[in-house]
Amino acid sequence: MKKIALVIAAMMVSLASHAQFEAGKAYVGASLSGLDLSYSGLTEGKLSVQGKVGYLLVDNIMATAQLSYEKQKDVPYVLSVGAGGRYYIVQNGLYLGASALFKHHKGYNDLLPSVQVGYSFFVSRTVTIEPELYYEQSFKNHSDYSQFGLRIGIGIYLFKDPTQN
C-alpha cells in the first residue's frame, strides 16, 4: 500500500511541475552575483545585480530579456542589456540558457555571448530560488572581461495566457 501511495504522489508531483513551464506563462526574476562568487581578470571587489523578464513561448522554452548593473573596485559602473532563451531540460526545474549581452562603461563597449545552467527550486506554486552557473565570453579582451561565476536569484512565474489552451 505504501508503494502505491508513493507512486501516486510521484506522479502528482511530476504533473504539477510540468504545469510550471507551460506555454503562455510570464517570468520576472532578479539575481545577485559577485561577493567572490565570480571570476575574471578584473573582478576584485565586484558586485552585480540583474533583472530578467521572460515569456514561455512553448512548453519548456522561454525567451528572456535582462538588464544588469555591476560595481567593480576600480570601475565606477558597468551596465549591460541582453536577450536570450532558456530550455528546461527536465520537468523538475533544471535548465540551460544562452544569451547575448551588450556591456558598457565609460570608454568600453563589448558584445558577449553567455551560457548558463541552473535549477529552479519552487518554494511555492509560482516563486523559485534559482542558483545558476554562468560563463560570459568577451571577444574584445578575453583575459580581463570574460568571466564565469555563480548567481543566486529569485523568480516569479506569473500568469498563463487565457488565449492559449
Functional labels for PLM-detected ranges:
Residues 35-52, 66:
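Surface-exposed strand-loop-strand hairpins of Gram-negative outer-membrane beta-barrel proteins
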Residues 20-36:
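Transmembrane beta-strand segments of Gram-negative outer membrane beta-barrel proteins
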Residues 1-25, 159-165:
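Cleavable N-terminal export/targeting peptides
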Residues 27-31, 121, 145-165:
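Outer-membrane beta-barrel "beta-signal"
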Residues 32-36, 100-101, 134-137:
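Extracytoplasmic loops and strand-loop junctions of Gram-negative outer membrane beta-barrel proteins
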Residues 36-42, 70-74, 104-107, 139-143:
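Outer-membrane beta-barrel domain signature
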Residues 24-26, 43-49, 77-81, 109-113, ...:
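Residues that define the transmembrane beta-barrel architecture of outer-membrane proteins
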